[in-house]
Structure formats: C-alpha cells, structure tokens
Amino acid sequence: MIRGAVYPVDLGDAKRGHEQRGRRLGLVISIEQNAWSTVTIIPTSTSAQPAVFRPDVVIAGRDTRILIDQIRTIDTAYVTGELVDCLSRDDMAQVEYSLSRYLGLLRLQRSMGSSL
C-alpha cells in the first residue's frame, strides 16, 4: 500500500457509537515500508459535517472530507478493491497538518522546541 493512496475499504457493520462503518474510501497514511498485514487508514465521506480536523480534498473528481477523527488500523483483507486515486503533495500536507493538530502533536513539537 502506498501512503497517500485511496482504496475502497470495508469497515464492517458495527451498530454502536459514532464510528464509520460499511464500504467507503480510505486514505492510506501508514508508511510504505510497513511489511505487516495491516494498514492505517483514514475513512472519507462526501456528506460528513465540516470540522477543522476534516480537510476537504477532491478524490476521483468528488469533493470529499478526510475524517481525521476516525483514523484506524485495519487488516489488509478489508481493502476491497483497486487503487482509486492518490492525493497530491499539497493535499497530503493538509491531511498531515490536520492529523498533527487533532492528535495534539503540534503543541508537543512546540513544547519540545528544536530538540525534535
């Protein structure tokens, strides 16, 4: 799997909580050198509510929100189809910034100063 690539994924049929479920597109954010049978993805939605941690991008010609708050690691068996699209560098930078902000890594980086 390629970081920044978008694939169809099946997130199952969980009936509780607010987790995304069912078949949808997922953005791969794990590194390419990951030799495990899992991949870390961020689900996408064309109808989710906007939020500062849900960047808007265009995937396969459709306006799409990247649901940073729904990040998860799945078995590669749940990747159900072929490559749909790849995000541009600018779009990936926007996703990475939103992810860092959502996880509080920007504050951590600032508090550690230049020691990173």
Predicted regions and their residues:
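Conserved functional hotspots at enzyme active or ligand-binding sites that engage polyanionic ligands
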Residues: 1-116
